[in-house]
């Protein structure tokens, strides 16, 4: 039997589809999410409903976002879910989550077993809506979770670490082996909880500056900051801002990156 076929559906590589089928893992994720009736719950990529069905047992209504038209059609006909679901057949990268929260009249609780080929850009998309989100629970490649929670002075600390920690508190929930899926991915997975900060610990006046600085620094992570950020800051400015010019991108804390971003916002002439 083709191991890409599960419950009569052929897993599509272009959508990065791996379907969760381990009941212990499913129960653990649902318990971690702990959805309550009346909350504005949104699932990204429900697939064959491994999480959708048990979440549906606890909810009167909730929303799912599914790009695959065949899977969306299955959910529309699901005997116990069809009357509970608002199905949005659309790419989650194009969704206005602030509009969904406004329609719901409350912040969203977002969860999903994210396709690994879009998980990082999708999280960056969601970070722009954190004021409209209460929390997020995602199944991700374990390596991505390691990057999310990484601290400075580690090889896994990167732009994703800085931007995620700027917006959210990040809590690993559980690790998931490949055999919990069909077809089994070639990597380990993990579930993570992201809770947007009620108040940003290190607010920046222009998030584009933080994005630009972290992109330039980590795209040249083996260079010293004197070189990787040389087109934005003089060595003297870096020193005045408390940055060691001989350090590298992974040696700088989230707070220090935010300090750099705010300085750059206040000195627009330096951005040329």
UniProtKB/Swiss-Prot annotation:
* First-level EC class: transferase
State where it is primarily located.
Answer: cytoplasm
Molecular-function GO term, any one: 16S rRNA (adenine(1518)-N(6)/adenine(1519)-N(6))-dimethyltransferase activity
Q: Which InterPro entries match?
A: KsgA/Erm, rRNA_Ade_diMease-like_C, rRNA_Ade_Mease_Trfase_CS, rRNA_Ade_methylase_Trfase_N, rRNA_adenine_dimethylase, SAM-dependent_MTases_sf
Q: Which residues cross the membrane?
A: none
PROSITE patterns, per the entry: RRNA_A_DIMETH, SAM_RNA_A_N6_MT
* GO CC annotation: cytosol
**Which reaction does this chain catalyze?**
adenosine(1518)/adenosine(1519) in 16S rRNA + 4 S-adenosyl-L-methionine = N(6)-dimethyladenosine(1518)/N(6)-dimethyladenosine(1519) in 16S rRNA + 4 S-adenosyl-L-homocysteine + 4 H(+)
Q: Which UniProt keywords apply?
A: Cytoplasm, Methyltransferase, RNA-binding, rRNA processing, S-adenosyl-L-methionine, Transferase
The domain of life is Bacteria
CDD domains per the UniProt record, alphabetical: AdoMet_MTases
Entry EC number(s)? 2.1.1.182
Q: Specify which residues bind S-adenosyl-L-methionine according to the UniProt entry for this protein.
A: 18, 20, 45, 66, 91, 113
User: Which SUPFAM superfamilies does the record associate with it?
Assistant: S-adenosyl-L-methionine-dependent methyltransferases (SSF53335)
Tell where it localizes: Cytoplasm
Task of the protein = Specifically dimethylates two adjacent adenosines (A1518 and A1519) in the loop of a conserved hairpin near the 3'-end of 16S rRNA in the 30S particle. May play a critical role in biogenesis of 30S subunits.
**PANTHER family documented for this protein:** DIMETHYLADENOSINE TRANSFERASE, DIMETHYLADENOSINE TRANSFERASE-RELATED
The UniProt entry's sequence similarity note says: Belongs to the class I-like SAM-binding methyltransferase superfamily. rRNA adenine N(6)-methyltransferase family. RsmA subfamily.
Q: What is this protein called?
A: Ribosomal RNA small subunit methyltransferase A
Please give the organism: Pectobacterium atrosepticum (strain SCRI 1043 / ATCC BAA-672) (Erwinia carotovora subsp. atroseptica)
Q: Which gene encodes it?
A: rsmA
């Amino acid at each position: 039997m083709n191991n890409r076929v599960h419950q009569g559906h052929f897993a599509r590589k272009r959508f990065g589809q791996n379907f969760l089928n381990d009941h212990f893992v499913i129960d653990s994720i649902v318990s971690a999410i702990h959805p309550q009736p009346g909350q504005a719950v949104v699932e990204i990529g429900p697939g064959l409903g491994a999480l959708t069905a048990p979440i549906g047992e606890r909810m009167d209504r909730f929303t799912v976002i599914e790009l695959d038209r065949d899977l969306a059609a299955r959910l529309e006909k699901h005997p116990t879910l069809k009357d509970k679901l608002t199905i949005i057949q659309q790419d989650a990268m194009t969704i206005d989550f602030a509009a969904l929260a406004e329609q719901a009249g409350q912040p969203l609780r977002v969860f999903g077993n994210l396709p690994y080929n879009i998980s990082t850009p999708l999280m960056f998309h969601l970070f722009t809506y954190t004021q409209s989100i209460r929390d997020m629970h995602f199944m991700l490649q374990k390596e991505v979770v390691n990057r999310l929670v990484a601290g400075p002075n580690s090889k896994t600390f990167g732009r994703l670490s800085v931007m995620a920690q700027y917006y959210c508190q990040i809590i690993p929930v559980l690790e998931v082996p490949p055999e919990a899926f069909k077809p089994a991915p070639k990597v380990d997975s993990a579930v993570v909880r992201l809770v947007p900060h009620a108040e940003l610990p290190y607010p920046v006046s222009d998030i584009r500056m933080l994005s630009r600085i972290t992109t330039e620094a980590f795209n040249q992570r083996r260079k010293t900051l004197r070189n990787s950020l040389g087109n934005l800051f003089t060595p003297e400015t870096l020193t005045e801002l408390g940055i060691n010019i001989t350090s590298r991108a992974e040696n700088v804390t989230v707070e220090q990156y935010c300090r750099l971003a705010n300085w750059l916002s206040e000195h627009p002439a330096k951005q040329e």
